[in-house]
């Protein structure tokens, strides 16, 4: 666990980056179902990252420190503002617990509550819910929640966990003043009046990576959806294949030279001989263009993609029939209603 004792803002920003990595990277201790989804952070209006210590003997007390950052209108993250956390609780609890917390601010009103300064009570001023977990969680799951704040906690100690209900978040004005070398309020820091400091670059690097992950994930999802829709559309638009096809044989194909080659070539489909006798071979092969993709279903079928140009070796007078053609050195039969004459 990280140090919950309040320190300067540079150290708090460094601690925040470390905590955020621990909550979002897959490790031997964190499986893909135990991390904060990229879209939760990518869509967040702000984040508060803290370390908290909780001690109890009949009455429990908690305290800790961290930072809060907000997303600016241009999509970038604001400079960090130092915060503290404090709270009291009842119940017969004995022990000490140190926890790392990531608090996701889902709405602008949550950021504004942090920016106004003073004491902010979680569960009073803002509705709190345990945040969703899992790398493959769909983005709309988080959007369906009405909670202004998501919380994530990792604890080590004798308590089962940390409840933030009733905890107060406090603006650490003196820490901000020392770091920014001026009297400055959280509002001015979180709403972009202060340039983000180089000392917090590690934090910004990991925050920006979530936007990139989310965008890449969205592109992959959109590509898969488009591919599925295209397959559905293609399946609807494909014309029916001819019902009758030449009879298939398991005999190997043998190719000989000369006029005998055509007859031996059709041993894979013995029925094709009468088919050719009915039509005859073309003296000058013609070309057709595939309107649809065709994936062969039996040996001897000619595979092609929409747009391929196929050389026709022999054909019938009907387009609702099987023709024979050649493409990229392969010879086979194909449904004639899948192509158009050039």
UniProtKB/Swiss-Prot annotation:
PROSITE patterns to which the protein is assigned, alphabetical: SH3
Gene3D superfamilies hit by this protein: SH3 Domains (2.30.30.40)
Keyword Signal attached: no
Biased composition regions of type Basic and acidic residues, renumbered to the chain: 226-239
GO molecular function terms listed in the Swiss-Prot or TrEMBL record: phosphatase binding; phosphatidylinositol binding
Location of the SH3 domain: 283-342
Keywords linked to the UniProt accession: SH3 domain
Compositional bias (Polar residues): 245-263
GO-annotated cellular components: ruffle membrane
GO biological process entries: phosphatidylinositol biosynthetic process; regulation of ruffle assembly
Top-level taxon: Eukaryota
Subunit structure: Interacts with SH3D19.
Annotated family: Belongs to the SH3YL1 family.
Name of the featured protein: SH3 domain-containing YSC84-like protein 1
